[in-house]
């Protein structure tokens, strides 16, 4: 897998499944009602996680996104000359302007400027998963797309876009020691690291979100909104038990996007 979470070459030949044509291709009217809270994760919080973040927000889901790398790494003029930035300190807009000043032809041709242009419309800058203060109010992120509903700083489902990111998230959650005792589903969808596959992956993520949200709403109605929304283990058990079946059905619709799942704890 690419060590850089941005486009690194020609797109793969895999095509989206026929079932993706279900209204998952952009903004849509909000049908109202309950919405699960999502978090998307990749290495640098640039390409795949941001495509997922944008699409989930357009589908009216509360969503945040992160990267798991030590630094933000973007392709440079050669493989030995990447552009490197710090998480939480560098805005997408400043990265855009820096690369545009360095070599506009190169960074327009390889898709970085287009990607960064999208990202700066979604939120301020790349955030690192390991620095996320889970359960703390996200008061500085009210202008991010998908921020409504994420004010409490917790998610119901974390979707990673690469196995190493899934491993990093699971390891970090174990190290934190589950202080909130709140269940969270961590799902990895293996999305190849280029623009085309990120776009396909984004649609697949929304398809999965819709399926998960449907069963969550059903279980919430059974146990009561207050109990379910509290995130307590007992109130969420019905939903938790149904997730593997939903994921198996989703996998049949998206056979080119291998998925892995586990139940973890905040």
UniProtKB/Swiss-Prot annotation:
Subcellular location: Nucleus
EC number: 3.1.3.16
One function term, GO molecular function aspect: protein tyrosine phosphatase activity
Subunit composition and interactions: Component of the cleavage and polyadenylation factor (CPF) complex.
UniProt source species: Neurospora crassa (strain ATCC 24698 / 74-OR23-1A / CBS 708.71 / DSM 1257 / FGSC 987)
Source domain of life: Eukaryota
The keyword Hydrolase belongs to this UniProt entry's keyword annotation: yes
Name of encoding gene: ssu-72
Keyword field: Hydrolase, mRNA processing, Nucleus, Protein phosphatase
GO-annotated biological processes: intracellular phosphate ion homeostasis; mRNA 3'-end processing; positive regulation of telomere maintenance via semi-conservative replication; regulation of pericentric heterochromatin formation; regulation of siRNA-independent facultative heterochromatin formation; sno(s)RNA transcription; termination of RNA polymerase II transcription; termination of RNA polymerase II transcription, exosome-dependent
InterPro entries xrefs: RNA_pol_II_suA
Membership in a protein family: Belongs to the SSU72 phosphatase family.
Main location: nucleus
Protein name: RNA polymerase II subunit A C-terminal domain phosphatase ssu-72
Reactions that this protein is recorded to catalyse: O-phospho-L-seryl-[protein] + H2O = L-seryl-[protein] + phosphate; O-phospho-L-threonyl-[protein] + H2O = L-threonyl-[protein] + phosphate
Taxonomic placement: Eukaryota, Fungi, Dikarya, Ascomycota, Pezizomycotina
């Amino acid at each position: 897998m690419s060590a850089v979470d941005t486009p690194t070459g020609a797109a793969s030949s895999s095509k989206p499944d026929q079932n993706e044509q279900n209204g998952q291709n952009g903004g849509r009217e909000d049908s109202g009602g309950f919405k699960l809270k999502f978090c998307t994760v990749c290495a640098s919080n640039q390409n795949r996680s941001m495509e997922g973040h944008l699409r989930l927000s357009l589908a009216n889901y509360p969503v945040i996104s992160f990267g798991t790398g030590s630094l933000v790494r973007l392709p440079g003029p050669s493989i030995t000359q990447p552009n490197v930035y710090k998480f939480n300190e560098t805005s997408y807009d400043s990265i855009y302007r820096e690369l545009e000043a360095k070599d506009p032809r190169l960074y327009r041709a390889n898709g970085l400027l287009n990607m960064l242009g999208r990202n700066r419309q979604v939120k301020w800058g790349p955030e690192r998963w390991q620095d996320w203060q889970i359960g703390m109010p996200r008061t500085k992120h009210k202008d991010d797309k998908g921020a409504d509903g994420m004010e409490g700083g917790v998610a119901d489902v974390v979707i990673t876009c690469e196995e190493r990111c899934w491993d990093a998230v699971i390891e970090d959650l174990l190290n934190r020691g589950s202080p909130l005792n709140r269940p969270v589903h961590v799902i990895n969808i293996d999305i190849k690291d280029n623009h085309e596959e990120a776009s396909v992956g984004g649609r697949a993520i929304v398809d999965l979100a819709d399926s998960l949200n449907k069963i969550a709403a059903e279980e919430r109605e059974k146990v009561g909104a207050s109990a379910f929304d509290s995130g307590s283990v007992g109130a969420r058990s019905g939903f938790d038990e149904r997730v593997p079946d939903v994921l198996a059905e989703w996998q049949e619709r998206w056979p080119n996007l291998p998925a892995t799942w586990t139940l973890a704890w905040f």
